[in-house]
Design a protein with these regions (language model features):
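Membrane-embedded segments
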Residues: 73, 77-161
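Secreted/periplasmic serine-hydrolase-like ester/acetyl group-modifying domain
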Residues: 142-261, 341-357
Length: 514
């Protein structure tokens, strides 16, 4: 009887174990599948976009632990101003930019807490733009930003009790939002099934590529822009503007957290046409809490960095404006805060990303045809040439040799105007056609991922019905302009970076963009 009882009890225990294993397996499998769905449905903003928040936050988790001495937080102003690459290359200081579009101080606070799980920064630099009401023409909640902006920052945070706390806080401040949807993203993004694209299935490779330590590289200028910075005397006579309620509450929390952790907190405001009223309010707060405040809208500081609103842009500086602010802060961090240089090989990778982004920007500013062709010697570029009409009469030997150097092989001098020429040359090889006949040529680049098509159809009797088309990844790039029409596709950013016409029927060889 004893053996029978033991056998029966053992059988029951075995059934319980099997049941437990099945339950655990089910939970793990369900969690894995939900995680996959969440990752797939989550909107992606990679290094090849204007505001690359996906790379910003997922790249952060790839950093070596305790490898960052300075953290930057703030809005899009901070994203395109504080350049960790420039600070490292100049001063050897390791830093990371955790800013995002319209970053609420609530989000800044929770991302600072998240960052402190992995890093032990000596200094935190906080952009103060979002301390004040973001705009008058927006339906604002107490987050002082849109839901989309909150999610761009919070979707990238790893699931944890802290993220759940942040989600509940956000939902309390803005009752239109669901706390649970910050952990289970499919609740918010289930409708994206019909809009999924390549980016939704290549997250691992895009994160492996990496960005520029959270910095976004932008170009552009504002010819004729005039900005008169205010003086400290202007601020002394001004009435301080009130901070946005929730923003001040969470500024207090950030200040207290930094003090508790022994971190030096620096307040900043980048060149953005800010007011002396805001300066006075922020400076009063900074002085009351023993914090340094650098407002680059104040005349002496604006002059010190030789900032120029027309050349460097306000609010969202181009990369040259960002370099000016970053050089200044780097000197402050090294000199006044004693942040020492240290070697970090990861900056070699981010330097390559930054250099390539700058090359793309400078390419779009070149107007000399010879200089332009010389700048196309980049292994990431695929060059499309579309010449549907007259193109040959003024092609010089020098220009032709530059085309040969780029890898094109067809002689284009002394070609009758009745000929058409199309070509594509890049990492996937060379394809060319020079013919009097109509053209229909299709192919793909990036290993078959990105399609293109040349189409010249003059079969209709009336010229108005003729077709002159070049499509690259569904973007129409065709034109009937005389000369050589060039489309530059960057395989690194997976995008068209420039389109120009070099009028090789004009001896002056004018270069224009279209």
């Amino acid at each position: 009887m004893t053996h029978k009882r033991l056998f029966t009890e053992g059988s029951k225990m075995g059934k319980h174990v099997k049941y437990a294993i099945k339950c655990v397996t089910f939970v793990l499998l369900t969690g894995f599948l939900v995680g996959m769905v969440n990752t797939c449905l989550k909107p992606k903003y990679y290094y090849n976009q204007m505001w690359p928040s996906t790379n910003t936050y997922l790249d952060f988790y790839n950093l070596d632990k305790n490898s960052v001495d300075v953290l930057f937080l703030g809005s899009s102003h901070a994203m395109c101003t504080f350049n960790p690459q420039i600070i490292y290359d100049t001063y050897g200081i390791t830093s990371y930019n955790l800013a995002s579009e319209q970053q609420s101080l609530v989000v800044s606070y929770y991302w600072l807490r998240e960052a402190l799980k992995y890093q032990t920064p000596k200094v935190v630099v906080l952009d103060t733009y979002m301390l004040y009401k973001f705009g008058a023409n927006y339906v604002y909640n107490d987050m002082n930003c849109s839901e989309g902006s909150v999610r761009k920052a919070m979707d990238g945070m790893r699931p944890s009790p802290l993220k759940w706390e942040a989600a509940r806080t956000i939902a309390q401040i803005d009752p239109t939002q669901s706390a649970l949807s910050y952990l289970f993203l499919n609740i918010r993004y289930h409708a994206r099934w019909s809009n999924l694209n390549e980016d939704d299935f290549t997250e691992s490779s895009m994160i492996e590529h990496g960005g520029v330590k959270g910095f976004t590289t932008t170009g552009g200028t504002a010819p004729g822009a005039v900005f008169t910075p205010f003086t400290t005397a202007d601020a002394a006579d001004a009435e301080a503007e009130s901070m946005f309620g929730t923003s001040q509450i969470y500024l207090d929390k950030i200040t207290a957290l930094c003090a508790d952790k022994g971190i030096r907190l620096i307040l900043t405001n980048i060149p953005c046409d800010s007011s002396p009223e805001r300066y006075k309010a922020t400076k009063t707060y900074a002085d009351a809490h023993g914090l340094p405040y650098y407002d680059f809208n104040e005349a002496s500081l604006y002059s010190t960095i030789a900032y120029d609103a027309a050349e460097n842009l306000l609010s969202h500086p181009n990369y040259l404006g960002a370099e000016k602010v970053s050089h200044y802060l780097g000197a402050v961090l090294a000199g006044e805060y004693g942040i020492a240089a240290r070697a970090d090989a990861s900056y070699d990778k981010s330097r390559a990303v930054y250099t390539h982004a700058v090359a793309n920007i400078t390419l779009t500013q070149i107007t000399d045809p010879c200089e332009y062709l010389n700048s196309l010697q980049n292994s990431a570029y695929t060059i499309f040439i579309f010449a549907p009409k007259a193109f040959s009469s003024c092609i010089s030997e020098g220009l032709m040799n530059q085309l040969f150097t780029l890898g094109f092989s067809t002689e284009l001098r002394e070609i009758p105007d009745s000929y058409h020429y199309c070509a594509v040359n890049g990492p996937d090889g060379l394809t060319e056609q020079l013919t009097m006949e109509d053209i229909s040529l299709s192919g793909s680049i990036r290993g078959g991922v990105t399609p293109y098509r040349f189409l010249i159809d003059t079969s209709v009797m009336v010229p108005e019905g003729h077709t002159f088309s070049l499509t690259v990844d569904s973007t129409e790039c065709g034109t009937q302009a005389p000369g050589l029409n060039l489309v530059v596709y960057d395989s690194d950013t997976k995008s068209i970076v420039d389109r120009v016409n070099i009028n090789t029927t004009d001896p002056a060889l004018p270069l224009t963009r279209y």
